[in-house]
Amino acid sequence: MATTEAQHSRLPYRAIALDLDGTLTNNAKEVTPLTRETLLKAQADGAHIILASGRPTYGIIPVADSLGLEETGGYILAYNGGKIVDCKTMEELYSNFLPAEVIPMLHQYARSKGYALLGYAGNEIVTEMPDDQYVKEESRINHMNIRKVECLTDHLEAHPTKLLM
């Protein structure tokens, strides 16, 4: 059976899953032009791009946008797979929340040890310790503002997927 040029140009893969930090992005947390061009071609050849990260959804969206995933129908696996989002529709396809009874225990433990604990509320990081170096780094990486709160548990999303200590 003869194979056409068009068949050769199609990738044998239907999906390409990529970790972000240190894999897809460089040290500046950016996708290089060559990588972007390669992934755009892969999408044109029929591959779906899946961005997988421990980052919150909001912190992955700029990378997804830079790769045109809102048009091509890629996916975001945020919070280390705790939330899966269809980039074309922004529909949550899957969510796995922290058990409600664990949140006060984590909060109390962090307070007792003097550790920063952060969570997310929309496009913001919420924390009682906004000057902590790790809170600032999370803000920088994800391009999210930090909001200082008196009591973290009063300001979290209704069903948090991730807290970071």
Predicted regions and their residues:
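A short, structured active-site edge motif that brings together acidic residues
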Residues: 74-84
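Substrate-recognition element of Asp-dependent hydrolases with the DxDx(T/V) motif
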Residues: 39-62, 118-120, 163-165
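Conserved ATPase-coupling elements of RecA-like P-loop NTPase cores
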Residues: 27-31
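A general structural motif
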Residues: 11-13, 46, 73, 114, ...
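Substrate-recognition/cap helix-loop segment adjacent to the acidic, metal-dependent catalytic center
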Residues: 56-76
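Catalytic-core regions built around general acid/base machinery
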Residues: 34-46, 105, 109
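Non-catalytic pre-domain segments flanking phosphatase-related domains
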Residues: 1-20
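HAD-like small-molecule phosphatases
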Residues: 82-165
